[in-house]
Amino acid sequence: MTANYSDIARTLIAAAIGSTILSAPLSLSAAVSQQPLSLTEGVAPNLLVTLDDSGSMAWAYAPDGLATSENLGRRAWRSNTFNSMYYDPNIVYRVPKQVKMVNGEVVVTDYPTPSFTNAPQNGYNSTSTKVNLSTKYRAQGSGTDFITSCGTGVFPTGVCNSGEAPAHYFQYTVSGTCPQTNPSSANSCYTYTPIGTTQQTNFAIWYSFYRTRSLATRSAANLAFYTLPENVRLTWGALNTCNIGAGSTSSSGTCSNNTIKRFSDQHRVNFFTWLGALPESGGTPLHNAMKRAGNFLMTDSKAYKDEDGSEYACRASYHILMTDGMWNNQPSGSINYDGSLDYPYKDEQANTLADWAYHYWATDLRPNLANRVKPYFPFETGNSANDKKDPRNNPADWQHMVNFTVGL
């Protein structure tokens, strides 16, 4: 996977197992504990997962501002240096996992490795259009369409025909007019590089499983969650098409039966079924998604009850919210929950995601239960007041929601 999505996968793993998320977006130096006490001892925690299914997730470029008509006709569009979604020859892309129920047991295997001469445009859908990348490769454009023009001065003579060419990328070379920071989009900074024999499989995996924001996110989440312990209680949702804890009765519905329960057996299979079919349509209503997660913990009795009906006041709850960009469809009203806090948490802006994240952390979501959630203090100085304010710690013992937000 690309460097960006390698980080996302690591972050998802860290969030899912209750470890500290890496502070720097491209730092991979921190080791992630695979068996934290929060998951191996005591009551199983709740893990709520919300993924972005907005229309922009179908795009094959990042950041958003790249998609100008000028850039689409330049070499830079086909270089990972300029367009971070494009193929990176320095990364080994991994095929995600298929998780199925076979004879009553969960079986995990790799998805089929795509063929360089017959690669599906969507590796999760075996019926999607197949492309011979050795001769018919086209880069994806500003939306879901593929580029049908060769541009001016982009390719060597005779290589491209109506946008079709052998699979390739363009290598950025740093020089006086081609700076290392804020890379130039000028064609002269990039060198055409066809995909050689040793990179054909790697390119095909990128094309089928990582080419777009949605494909890459699904693959990163797939690889992050397939080893998640069974004693985590999981429910999932999307911004537009599936609500946290909706609990549809059919394992083949929009949510693939996402009733919160331990991440085992058919429930584990249901999650990966849903993940592989995540759609790409609509806006980015992040506030509503966070509110749905918090309200689920506040109002649904299943959030604190095991399947045998036992209810636990010490159960911790975590929410992972992933998105590719800025929110829209903001709720009405003027809410500034963090406006009364000390800096650096205080701000004067109302209706931000931080307001809702603070609200569902500070509010006792189940006042009828005793406050028995175990506080988290990995960093202590001996000064109790300061330790409680340290953002690396969590002093809350009431039922609350801890948010991990992942942005592209």
Regions from the language model: what does each represent?
Residues 26-408:
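P/S/T/G-enriched low-complexity
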Residues 12-24:
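Bacterial N-terminal signal peptides
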Residues 2-14:
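Bacterial N-terminal signal peptides that target proteins for export
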